[in-house]
Curated annotation (Swiss-Prot):
UniProt name for this protein: Protein TonB
InterPro entries in UniProt: TonB-dependent_transducer (IPR051045), TonB/TolA_C (IPR006260), TonB_C (IPR037682)
Taxonomic path: Bacteria, Pseudomonadati, Pseudomonadota, Gammaproteobacteria, Lysobacterales
Protein species of origin: Xanthomonas campestris pv. campestris (strain ATCC 33913 / DSM 3586 / NCPPB 528 / LMG 568 / P 25)
Record's function text: Interacts with outer membrane receptor proteins that carry out high-affinity binding and energy dependent uptake into the periplasmic space of specific substrates. It could act to transduce energy from the cytoplasmic membrane to specific energy-requiring processes in the outer membrane, resulting in the release into the periplasm of ligands bound by these outer membrane proteins.
Domain named TonB C-terminal: residues: 133-223
PROSITE patterns documented for this protein: TONB_CTD (PS52015)
Cytoplasmic side: 1-23
C-alpha cells in the first residue's frame, strides 16, 4: 500500500496564515501511518528463531553378566568288571621215553709192543754262540748307555737285558740280538737301540783283526 503525502502549499502572501494545530496533528498522523506500514513490510522478512532443542540425556546402567553355569558333573566311573575265572588245566602227561638201545660189545685187541709209537724226542737246545771273544772298551765314549723308557720309568719297571752283539773287523756293530730278556718289551728295545750305536775294539786272531761277537749285559735300575 502506497500513501502519497500531499502538502498543500499556500501562498504566504495570499493567506498569510500560520500552521494550525489541526494541520500539525494531521501531518503527524500521516507520518505515523507510513511508519506503521513500513514496519509491517519489514517484520515478515525476519524469520523467527527456532526454539533451542533441549539436550537429551540417556542414563545407562551397567549390569554384571550372569556367571557361567557350572560344568556338568563327570560321568560316574565304569564299574570294574570281575576278571573271568581262571580254569585249572591239568598238565599233560609226558609220553614214556623208550630206553636207549644197548651198545654193541666190541672186542678191542690188546696192542702189541711193535704197534706202540714213541713220541719224538724234543730238539736239543741251541748251542751258545761261538767266538764271543771281542774285547769291550769300557772307557770308550762311543758306548752311551740306553735311555730309560718313560712308560717303564713311571711304572717303576726294572730289569736286566743280556745282548749278543756282532762286531766286524773295524769294531762296528753289524747285528744285535737278545740272549736274555728283561721280560719288558720297552726295556729290551731301548737296550738294542743303544747297542746299535756302540763302538767296540775288534777281536784279534793270529795277530790280525777279525769279526766276532760280544756279550753285553744292560741293567735298568731305579737308583
Amino acid at each position: 500500500m502506497t500513501e502519497q503525502l500531499v502538502i498543500h502549499r499556500h501562498d504566504y502572501d495570499a493567506g498569510n496564515q500560520g500552521l494550525s494545530w489541526a494541520r500539525i496533528i494531521g501531518i503527524a498522523f500521516v507520518i505515523a501511518l507510513h511508519l506503521t506500514a513500513l514496519m509491517m513490510l519489514l517484520i515478515p522478512a525476519v524469520a523467527p528463531k527456532a526454539p533451542a532443542e533441549k539436550e537429551r540425556t540417556t542414563m545407562v546402567t551397567l549390569v554384571d553378566a550372569p556367571p557361567p553355569p557350572p560344568p556338568p558333573p563327570p560321568p560316574p566311573p565304569p564299574e570294574d568288571k570281575p576278571p573271568p575265572p581262571v580254569k585249572n588245566l591239568s598238565p599233560p602227561k609226558p609220553s614214556p621215553v623208550p630206553p636207549p638201545p644197548e651198545a654193541p660189545v666190541v672186542d678191542v685187541p690188546e696192542p702189541r709192543p711193535s704197534d706202540i709209537v714213541t713220541p719224538p724226542s724234543p730238539p736239543a737246545p741251541p748251542a751258545p754262540p761261538s767266538d764271543i771273544g771281542a774285547s769291550v772298551d769300557i772307557s770308550s765314549k762311543n758306548m752311551n748307555p740306553p735311555k730309560y723308557p718313560p712308560a717303564a720309568f713311571r711304572a717303576g719297571v726294572q730289569g736286566e737285558v743280556i745282548l749278543i752283539v756282532d762286531v766286524d773287523a773295524n769294531g762296528n756293530v753289524t747285528n744285535v740280538s737278545v740272549e736274555k730278556s728283561s721280560r719288558n718289551r720297552d726295556l729290551d728295545r731301548a737296550a738294542m737301540d743303544a747297542a746299535r750305536k756302540w763302538k767296540f775294539n775288534a777281536s784279534t786272531v793270529n795277530g790280525q783283526k777279525a769279526a766276532g761277537r760280544v756279550r753285553v749285559p744292560v741293567n735298568f735300575a731305579l737308583n
